[in-house]
């Protein structure tokens, strides 16, 4: 018996729906449009800020977007923020200071609310224009996401320090940029936020399918009844998926959705 069509489609952007040319292919876009027309809900789940949806927005239809890994729930149809899950800047600051006491070397930036862009310490993305300040200055107020960039080859111990040292206090993950940690409020992940939304829509995890390629998609994979890792996904993501699909540059999302739509 063929699998029933999903009622909820969760799609990561970079390395999944978006190709290496930084665009959504016509085939992928058309598959999402057919799914929406057939009554399925489409949710874009990305680490991107809202402002960086703009280059691909025309291909996303009237979806809901989980930006900053779920910290911001954004309605593309009405162009407004539906939910904001902020991290207390001082909580983030104390975590950074504690890890730095161990001698680990890294630089920090934060994303403000809502979508006002990066502000960072000196040395974070040198050559990139952004407001600069001390750790105390950039952590003033609520933040959407904290960013930790390792210096040199020190990523692994920094990942270990934040991911294990603050379990239950911070949500720590990484996506496509080498040597970059993304930190949100505890409990805020693609999977955690979609669980709340799906309950409101009356959709069970068994009726959902998720597409992704990086560790920040793992919570979404654990939540959804079906999950598809891209052929280009990291090994741990492939292991967590119920299926491994094609490379993202080969319309991998459409290849799966065309079974039903």
Residue ranges and their predicted role:
Residues 5-21, 221:
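Asp-based phosphoryl-transfer active-site loop
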Residues 15, 35, 46, 69, ...:
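Residue-level signal for inorganic ion chemistry
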Residues 21-124:
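Active-site phosphate-binding/coordination module
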Residues 59-61, 69, 77, 166-168, ...:
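Short, structured coil segments at secondary-structure junctions
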Residues 98, 102-223, 232:
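Conserved acidic, metal-coordinating active-site core of Asp-based
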Residues 223, 228-261:
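Asp-based, Mg2+/Mn2+-dependent phosphohydrolase catalytic module
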């Amino acid at each position: 018996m063929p699998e029933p069509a999903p009622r909820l489609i969760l799609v990561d952007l970079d390395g999944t729906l978006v190709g290496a040319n930084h665009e959504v292919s016509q085939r992928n876009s058309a598959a999402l449009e057919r799914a929406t027309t057939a009554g399925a809900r489409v949710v874009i789940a990305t680490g991107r800020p809202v402002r960086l949806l703009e280059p691909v927005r025309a291909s996303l239809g009237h979806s809901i977007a989980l930006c900053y890994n779920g910290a911001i729930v954004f309605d593309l149809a009405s162009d407004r923020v539906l939910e904001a899950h902020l991290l207390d800047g001082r909580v983030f600051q104390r975590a950074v200071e504690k890890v730095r006491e161990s001698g680990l070397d890294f630089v920090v930036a934060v994303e403000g609310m809502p979508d006002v862009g990066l502000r960072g310490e000196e040395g974070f993305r040198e050559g990139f224009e952004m407001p600069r300040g001390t750790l105390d200055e950039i952590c003033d107020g609520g933040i959407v996401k904290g960013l930790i960039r390792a210096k040199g080859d020190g990523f692994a111990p920094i990942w270990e320090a934040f991911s294990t040292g603050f379990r239950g206090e911070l949500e720590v993950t990484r996506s496509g940029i080498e040597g970059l940690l993304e930190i949100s409020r505890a409990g805020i992940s693609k999977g955690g936020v979609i669980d709340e939304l799906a309950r409101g829509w009356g959709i069970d995890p068994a009726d959902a399918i998720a597409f992704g390629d990086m560790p920040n998609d793992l919570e979404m994979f654990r939540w959804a009844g079906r999950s598809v890792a891209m052929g280009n996904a990291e090994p741990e993501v492939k292991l967590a998926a119920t299926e491994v699909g094609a490379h993202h540059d080969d319309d991998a999302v459409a290849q799966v959705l065309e079974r039903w739509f």
